[in-house]
Amino acid sequence: MEARFVHGKILRNAGSGIFYRMEVAIPERIDFVPGQFAMVSGWPGNDPLLPRPLAIFRSGGARGHGTVEFVYKVVGRGTALLSGLHAGDPLALTLPLGHGFEFPGEDRSWWLVGGGVGFSSVFPVAAALEGERADFEIFLGASTAGSCPAPA
């Protein structure tokens, strides 16, 4: 799928501590390959200048409208600004970007490993493997027991 620039509107942006989960309404549904990402910005002005890369956690939608979800960690000024946005706030997104993960066609068992906020790329892979009825195990790591949020 070819990347495109879209304007979105935040449906929810909730978090606890340094991890946040953001759901965004976009004009049309996007298909993505697990491992792809978006460049996201939503603050006024040019400071910071560059949008922030966020892994696509999930996408959905119907009837010409779409949604895209991100799980992100506040690590600097840009993600701190994103964490302060609320439902209804506008965003600018370029997506989907990157090649994503490739899955060999042969039958095998998979170990999916993610650490910290990197877990957000593991779950789209698990969903793809589940659709193929593949065997897999998920291993998540974090610096503390409470610092790796489990998705709903």
For each predicted feature, which ranges?
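Ferredoxin-reductase
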Residues: 1-87, 143
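FNR/FR-type flavoprotein reductase catalytic core
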Residues: 77-152
